[in-house]
């Protein structure tokens, strides 16, 4: 992996199974681009491609050729990879009965460390196709999404996307990957929530347009409210709280809190940086979940004041958890601990003349037009939050120090009235 990164051989927009990358960083980048485009009055179409059993259909000869000619692997290293891929067998066993042994002629070994990496290298030529057509894209292992901002005044605005899809299908067929048209989904975003569906040619994608899609575990709606996602989180969290009530009598408070974090908090925090700037009504539903979990853990009654309970548990409220995640991504981006595609969204503030502000580690805040569009984009919201932090937090020397200082600061903001 170090060789691939140092040699700039890995796809920059492939976020699967790479250090400092995650589903969240991938979605932050994609949603940033879409929010900025719609903030500028454009429409944007997002397409989620489906590859059926992609890991199982990799052609070994093509993969070896790719490793040799695209990645530059040769000699003993290439021979070792050949021995790893070829002459593999499998059988099916049920109880004491088993099938005859059969050769595995295709696919990368699943469940292995090398499998996902080899698959991502197998997909390397896809990036050139997307770039040829000028279509932004992002990959997470075998999850592939491409999106295109466009203006209604453009001539044939969706033509680059449609031509790109044609080439992608041809490439996949040539490389023994099964492109599943029926499971491919598309969603259209407008400049505002009430935007009408534009009269543009989406060809076969028209029948696959949805008002809401699930992208890397996050439900995204065409109005960008994230209401569908929040509703799903709330429903799932309360379901698990009800289930936990059955085991609560058998767990210590410490163990119960760990279980709550595993089943409830993890859902509240998953990709929560995408929720920066959403409406208070949306966040309040998530806050109800956290409040219920806090009362469940402490045995407090439904109508007991929640703020002292959260303070005693040292649980930051939902809105502060969202800000915390965004600022953590900023700190990591500024310290080479995040994907390059996120770091590129942040620019240092350059004062017009020599001022003390040059030493404040401030970021430039791009101008935006709409509170519910541009202001929510990572490239806008993140610098605004960062610049409002006290200097000693921005000057933190490591991730643990930054997280500790930031939590202490947010704790004081969230619970400053507790105990007064």
Where are these regions (language model features)?
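Hydrophobic/basic alpha-helical segments
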Residues: 1-420
């Amino acid at each position: 992996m170090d060789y691939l990164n140092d040699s700039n051989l890995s796809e920059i927009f492939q976020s699967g199974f790479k250090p400092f990358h995650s589903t969240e960083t991938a979605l932050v980048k994609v949603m940033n681009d879409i929010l900025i485009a719609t903030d500028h009055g454009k429409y944007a179409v997002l397409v989620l491609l489906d590859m059926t059993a992609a890991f199982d259909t990799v052609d070994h000869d093509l993969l070896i050729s790719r490793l040799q000619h695209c990645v530059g692997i040769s000699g003993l290293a290439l021979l070792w990879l050949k021995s790893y891929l070829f002459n593999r067998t499998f059988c099916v066993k049920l109880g004491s009965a088993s099938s005859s042994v059969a050769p595995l002629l295709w696919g990368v070994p699943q469940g292995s460390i090398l499998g996902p990496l080899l698959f991502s290298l197998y997909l390397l030529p896809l990036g050139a196709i997307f770039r040829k057509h000028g279509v932004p894209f992002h990959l997470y292992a075998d999850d592939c999404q491409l999106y295109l901002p466009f203006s209604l005044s453009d001539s044939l605005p969706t033509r680059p996307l449609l031509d790109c899809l044609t080439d992608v299908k041809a490439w996949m067929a040539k490389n023994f990957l099964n492109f599943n048209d029926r499971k491919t989904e598309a969603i259209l975003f407008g400049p505002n929530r009430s935007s009408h569906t534009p009269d543009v040619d989406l060809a076969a994608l028209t029948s696959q347009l949805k008002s809401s899609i699930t992208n890397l575990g996050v439900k995204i709606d065409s109005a960008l409210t994230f209401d569908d996602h929040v509703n799903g989180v709330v429903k799932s969290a309360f379901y698990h709280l009800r289930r936990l009530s059955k085991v609560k009598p058998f767990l210590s408070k410490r163990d119960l809190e760990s279980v709550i974090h595993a089943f409830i908090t993890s859902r509240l925090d998953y990709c929560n940086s995408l929720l920066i700037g959403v409406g208070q009504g949306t966040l309040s539903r998530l806050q109800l979940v956290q409040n219920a979990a806090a009362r469940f853990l402490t045995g407090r009654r439904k109508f007991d004041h929640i703020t002292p309970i959260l303070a005693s548990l040292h649980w930051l409220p939902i809105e502060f958890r969202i800000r915390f995640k965004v600022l953590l991504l900023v700190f990591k981006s500024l310290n080479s601990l995040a994907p390059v595609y996120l770091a590129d969204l942040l620019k240092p503030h350059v004062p017009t003349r020599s001022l003390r502000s040059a030493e404040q580690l401030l970021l430039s805040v791009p101008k935006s037009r709409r509170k519910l569009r541009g202001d929510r984009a990572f490239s806008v919201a993140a610098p605004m939050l960062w610049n409002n932090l006290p200097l000693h937090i921005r000057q933190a020397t490591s991730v643990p120090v930054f997280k500790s200082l930031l939590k202490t600061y947010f704790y004081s903001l969230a619970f400053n009235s507790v105990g007064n």
